[in-house]
A protein has these predicted regions:
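Recognition helix of helix-turn-helix/homeodomain-like DNA-binding domains
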Residues: 26-41
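Alpha-helical DNA-recognition elements
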Residues: 33, 37, 49, 67
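A short, Lys/Arg-rich alpha-helix, primarily the initiator
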Residues: 1-18, 23
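Short, charged recognition helix plus adjacent turn
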Residues: 62-69
Length: 69
């Protein structure tokens, strides 16, 4: 499972979904799905834009969470 840390990163910078959407041009719905970790797929361009905007590494935004079977 891929874990998205967008909500944590946005919280640290005190950014709202509207702020990120407005400043990056990314659709608000896309940001919302990433924020709430309900996105099933996302364009790499979106991930790149978010990382550049938040000045973070890909590994800060996304992580693979190993399942315990």
């Amino acid at each position: 499972m891929i874990k998205c840390h967008l909500s944590k990163l946005m919280g640290e910078k005190r950014l709202s979904i509207a702020d990120v959407s407005r400043d990056t041009g990314i659709n608000r719905g896309v940001i919302t799905r990433l924020y709430h970790e309900t996105a099933l797929r996302v364009d790499l361009e979106v991930i790149e834009t978010i990382c550049l905007y938040l000045d973070c590494e890909l590994s800060d935004l996304l992580a693979i969470e190993k399942s315990h079977k």
